[in-house]
């Protein structure tokens, strides 16, 4: 759940000392060309949230780079003095926010790197202060909505607007930058007209984040790349199930179910959605929903042909449909995009290792 690297031991490992976590205190450097902060944890995301809400301008690097003897991975935050010329007490604000969030800043004296792309290049892109909305109300899973609201309110500490399904059709989505669609069933609003509205919002530069069962509203619909993966069961097998004795049907249903299992996925760690991660991710799968790889889009996280559950229960028939399927993907539409999240990265707010995917999707 937390994404920690670990080792197993069959014997007791003695500890010789207690390790104390020190207090982070960043010094002001008025000669700094920029302040650099790494990107690989939820604490980094909270730091970014505070920076944006202080109206400070911040960028991120799309590529790995090295500068002044230090290596930084793609996704690293770069706060340039030149971007914040009108900010009063720039150094004090940046260091104070970093100290509050226990983030280590590395001040650098130049924007010219020893490897990678210089800070003035198009690969060092600005992060916008996004205006975010989430769908709520009838058809929305109250649990999924609650997970999202809790995440914004208590962890990311970033503003979020709820749009009820009762008046969704009357809302001008172009007043927002990001629209989150939680788990739910949206046939009442995401009909042909509603999907056209979503599509126009995305083409105009908006980001749509669809989670879990919300993906059904987009799958196999005209104008969208998402496709349901064809099941492995044959018509003959389905007919045999219909003729099965009542007492055997419960076992048969279990054979096609996933009630909570962990699967290891592959990642395209060059895609911004996966910044802060390595080349794999352990996902918690709560049902047997399966979607095909995107033909015209980015398959950022996916299950390869060898994918299987490494913990938890998954029926044998359900397992047949997970390999070579999508986990997280992006479909570009005009100036914006639709992010498909097959599994919920915020499940009950305890699956901490998935939360950075969600933040990457927002910003």
Model-predicted regions and their roles:
Residues 1-363:
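Intrinsic-disorder/low-complexity accessory segments
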């Amino acid at each position: 759940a937390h994404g920690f690297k670990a080792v197993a031991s069959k014997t007791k490992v003695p500890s010789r000392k207690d390790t104390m976590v020190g207090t982070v205190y960043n010094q002001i450097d008025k000669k700094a060309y920029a302040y650099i902060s790494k990107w690989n944890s939820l604490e980094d995301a909270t730091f970014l949230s505070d920076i944006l809400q202080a109206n400070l301008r911040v960028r991120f690097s799309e590529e790995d780079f090295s500068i002044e003897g230090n290596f930084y991975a793609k996704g690293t935050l770069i706060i340039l003095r030149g971007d914040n010329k009108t900010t009063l007490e720039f150094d004090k604000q940046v260091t104070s926010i970093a100290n509050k969030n226990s983030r280590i800043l590395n001040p650098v004296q130049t924007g010219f790197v020893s490897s990678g792309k210089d800070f003035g290049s198009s690969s060092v892109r600005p992060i916008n202060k996004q205006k975010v909305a989430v769908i709520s109300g009838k058809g929305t899973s109250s649990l999924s909505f609650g997970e999202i609201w809790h995440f914004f309110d208590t962890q990311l500490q970033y503003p979020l607007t709820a749009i009820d399904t009762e008046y969704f059709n009357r809302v001008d989505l172009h007043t927002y930058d990001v629209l989150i669609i939680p788990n739910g069933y949206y046939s009442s609003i995401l009909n042909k007209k509603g999907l056209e509205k979503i599509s126009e919002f995305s083409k105009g530069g908006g980001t749509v984040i669809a989670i879990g069962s919300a993906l059904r509203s987009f799958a196999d619909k005209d104008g969208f790349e998402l496709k349901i993966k064809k099941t492995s069961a044959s018509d003959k097998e389905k007919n045999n199930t219909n003729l099965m004795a009542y007492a055997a049907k419960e076992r048969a249903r279990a054979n096609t179910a996933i009630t909570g299992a962990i699967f290891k996925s592959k990642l395209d760690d060059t895609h911004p959605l996966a910044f802060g991660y390595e080349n794999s991710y352990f996902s918690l799968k709560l049902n047997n929903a399966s979607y095909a790889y995107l033909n015209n889009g980015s398959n950022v996280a996916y299950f390869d042909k060898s994918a299987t559950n490494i913990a938890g229960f998954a029926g044998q028939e359900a397992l047949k449909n997970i390999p070579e399927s999508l986990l997280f993907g992006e479909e570009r539409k005009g100036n914006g995009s639709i992010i498909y999240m097959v599994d919920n990265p915020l499940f009950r707010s305890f699956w901490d290792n998935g939360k950075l995917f969600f933040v990457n999707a927002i910003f």
